[in-house]
Amino acid sequence: HQHHPVRPRPDWVMLVIVLATTAAGLALQYILRQPFCAWMGIPPENSLANQFFYFAIGTGLLFLGYFMDYTILGRHIRLLYALWLAVGLFLAFSPWRVEYNGRLFYTAQWIWFFPVLFAGVLYSQRGRGAEGVRNCLLSLLGMWFLAYITPYMSALGILTVVCCGMLVMAVRRGAFGRCTRGRLVLAVSPLLALLGYFLFLLYAVPHVRERLALVFHPQADASVAGYQGSAIQYIMFGIPFAGSGTIDGAQWIKLDGAGDWMLLSVKYLWGWTAVFLLLAAVLLLLAWGFRIARRQNGLLARSVCM
């Protein structure tokens, strides 16, 4: 039969939201990096070079996405899957690989493209019943392998949840035939396996139990192993550190304020109002994205949007 390309129509509101929030994020990082850059003796703009580079690439891919024929994902999924895995292995084992904090940096970035690839897997396996659901789950093995060798276990967990969510939605909407309890259980089986593994770690590894306890009660830590939780409580609520160690949470957060501690830095500098405004922008981005996904009728379009 004749092939009909599937290309999305631009959602200009979403484009404006994405570009505005990204630009605001870059400006926020520039402001928050100044204490760290002053401490290191480097210009703030130099530390943002990588961020601007990724911003340019992301913006280009965003607009390029409106000219792409997404049925390619379904028609050539085996080739695309093999290329994705080959590039990931090259980034992991090539002489030019970059390691940062014990993690393969470029491989860690590459892994996050997998959900788009998984949308193509869903599309290619539609109508195949339980066999199609099984094949979709088998495609997760490549992502798990790359995440394991990177190592990037948080990405493994997050992407597994995302892909299983996409698969469950496809099963419930009848993409693999009649929705049955067996197919739903099969679709969520990786999540059940992750839960079982986590419970096993809680039982078998005392260190895991200790670290989890510090999340809920960091002040009970006398060896300062839970310094992050203590710093969070200090910055957010002014609760002093009660262990035997010492930590200048405010100064430490200020020096690392443009990374994982951005929200804490915003609270420390500008108060709760700024925190709620920042969260509102992120929630607006997520809400509009899910709104676009819910408006799609086809499996491929809905999966790519998700």
PLM regions with names:
Residues 1-95, 139-140, 306:
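A structural signal for hydrophobic alpha-helical transmembrane segments in multi-pass membrane proteins
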Residues 36-40, 87-107, 205-216, 248-250:
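Membrane-interfacial helix-loop-helix modules of multi-pass inner-membrane proteins that assemble, modify
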Residues 44-76, 110-128, 165-176, 287:
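Transmembrane alpha-helical segments and their membrane-water interfaces
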Residues 53-61, 266-289:
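Hydrophobic alpha-helical transmembrane segments
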Residues 93-127, 148-156, 220-222:
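Membrane-interface segments at transmembrane-helix junctions in multi-pass inner-membrane proteins
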Residues 130-149, 153-201:
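Hydrophobic alpha-helical segments of polytopic membrane proteins
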Residues 179-277, 300:
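Hydrophobic, glycine- and aromatic-enriched re-entrant/interface helices and adjoining loop segments
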